[in-house]
Each structure stands twice: as C-alpha cells, then as structure tokens.
Amino acid sequence: MGLPGSKALGGGLYELRDMGRGAGYRVYYTWVGDMIIILLAAGDKGSQERDIDLARRRLADLPDAP
C-alpha cells in the first residue's frame, strides 16, 4: 500500500510528488517492514532522472533493502 500521490518505480522504490503546490518537488522512499525510509528529498522534473538514479543507489546500500 502506498501513500496518496505516490508512484511505484519498481524494485521497492517509490516516488511521492508534491500534489499541486510549487515546482513539483519529489521525495523518494522505500518500505522496510513497517517503516518508511526516506532515500532522497529532491528537486523538480528537471532533475528527476538523476534523482531516481541516486535514490536507487541509496536503496541498494540499505542492509535490509527490499
């Protein structure tokens, strides 16, 4: 189950978008058990590809990564 405004990006990575405010900032996160782990609070659409790559690297570094 995700959060409102969230999108599954695969491999246990999720993107939460700012719904209708400002520049559309994003937060990338994962679930470990019943905890949400914030991997990256990031910029707007212009940096999205780089931000997702960084979030995926951080996810891979988690000891209990999904």
Task: Name these PLM-found stretches.
Residues 17-66:
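Enriched for short, Lys/Arg-rich terminal
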Residues 1-21:
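A short, surface-exposed loop/turn module that caps and links secondary-structure elements
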